[in-house]
């Protein structure tokens, strides 16, 4: 056998066949060639590795998809909570006009607590004044003498009725016809004057005049020791009424009546106020009158509305 044949047969193995039907023989078995680069993995191993990597990646995506909705809900809830807190602090800040525009949250809360305590004290004071007025009115009703007398109407009128005039002099029923009309009216006037003198806050001026001042947004009408403010401002301006009440409190004024009406563009405020009676003597000592206080308040309202 030559060298070429030996080299050509190196890739084959010779084996002995042990089959029963033949007496013996040889069988050539092909031998698989050895890999030329044993360091590189086979294609099957690479496929298996890729498949395992894909499975692992799919498992991670599934977990991410399961956790993602809860995380988004948590983010949305936190965002809404912060937005609600900002709105609440903004509304609370609008109710406190004495604070600067850029006040921190702690300052807003402290000022709100102080304002609430001050309002509670004011409420207690007003309740005491109300109770005193009720006691005074009940006492004056019990001490005022009244006279009941009958009068004789015509035949076409209703039966004899009972009247309660304000008079301190009893009148006999038989002297009703002879009682002069002028004397009766004089008694009525004198009784009314005596009753008016017992009022807690009487009006000193017998004749009351109306004085009116007007500007673009403010109309002031003064009647005695009371004033009527007509205010017209653009709608959707927060804190207007609160600022007006704060200004009244600054000048020791009490709000007796307030009405608010609005349309699509404007809001109208009608406020009846008076100077606190306990502060009138202090104003007179400072050389100021009630009218001067009302005018000063109106001027500050004009400046405030012009800045809106």
From Swiss-Prot:
Entry comment describing in which tissues the protein is expressed: Siliques. Not detected in roots, rosette leaves or flowers. Expressed in endosperm cells.
Localization terms from the record: Nucleus
Disordered: annotated segments: 1-76
Record keywords, A-Z: Developmental protein, DNA-binding, Nucleus, Transcription, Transcription regulation
Main location: nucleus
Disulfide bridge positions per record: none
Basic and acidic residues composition bias: residue spans: 60-76
Record InterPro entries: BHLH95-like, bHLH95_bHLH, bHLH_dom, HLH_DNA-bd_sf
Example of a GO cellular component annotation carried by this entry: nucleus
GO BP term, pick one: endosperm development
Ranges of residues in domain bHLH: 69-119
Quaternary structure, from the entry: Homodimer.
PANTHER family listed in its UniProt record: BHLH DOMAIN-CONTAINING PROTEIN (PTHR46772), TRANSCRIPTION FACTOR BHLH95 (PTHR46772:SF8)
Protein name per its UniProtKB record: Transcription factor bHLH95
Originating species: Arabidopsis thaliana (Mouse-ear cress)
């Amino acid at each position: 056998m030559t060298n070429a044949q030996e080299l050509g047969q190196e890739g084959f193995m010779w084996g002995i066949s042990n089959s029963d039907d033949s007496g013996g023989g040889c069988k050539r078995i092909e031998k698989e060639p050895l890999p030329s680069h044993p360091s590189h993995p086979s294609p099957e191993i690479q496929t298996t590795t890729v498949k395992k990597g894909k499975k692992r990646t799919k498992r991670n995506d599934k977990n991410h998809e399961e956790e993602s909705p809860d995380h988004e809900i948590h983010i949305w809830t936190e965002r809404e909570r912060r937005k609600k807190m900002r709105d609440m602090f903004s509304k609370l800040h609008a109710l406190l006009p004495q604070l600067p525009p850029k006040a921190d949250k702690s300052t807003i809360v402290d000022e709100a607590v102080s304002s609430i305590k001050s309002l509670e004290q004011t409420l207690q004071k007003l309740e005491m004044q109300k109770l005193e007025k009720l006691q005074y009115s009940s006492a004056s009703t019990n001490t005022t003498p009244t006279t009941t007398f009958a009068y004789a109407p015509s035949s076409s009128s209703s039966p004899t009725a009972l009247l309660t005039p304000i008079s301190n002099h009893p009148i006999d029923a038989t002297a009703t016809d002879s009682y002069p009309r002028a004397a009766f009216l004089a008694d009525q006037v004198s009784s009314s004057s005596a009753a008016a003198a017992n009022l807690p806050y009487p009006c000193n001026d017998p004749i009351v005049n109306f004085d009116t001042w007007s500007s673009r947004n403010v109309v002031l009408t003064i009647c005695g020791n009371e004033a009527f403010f007509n205010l017209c401002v653009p709608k959707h301006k927060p804190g207007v009424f609160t600022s007006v009440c704060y200004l009244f409190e600054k000048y020791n004024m009490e709000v007796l009546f307030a009405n608010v009406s609005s349309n699509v563009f404007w809001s109208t405020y009608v406020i009846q106020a008076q100077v606190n009676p306990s502060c009138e003597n202090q104003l007179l000592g400072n050389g100021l009158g009630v009218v001067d206080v009302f005018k000063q308040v109106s001027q500050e309202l004009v400046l405030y509305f012009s800045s809106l």
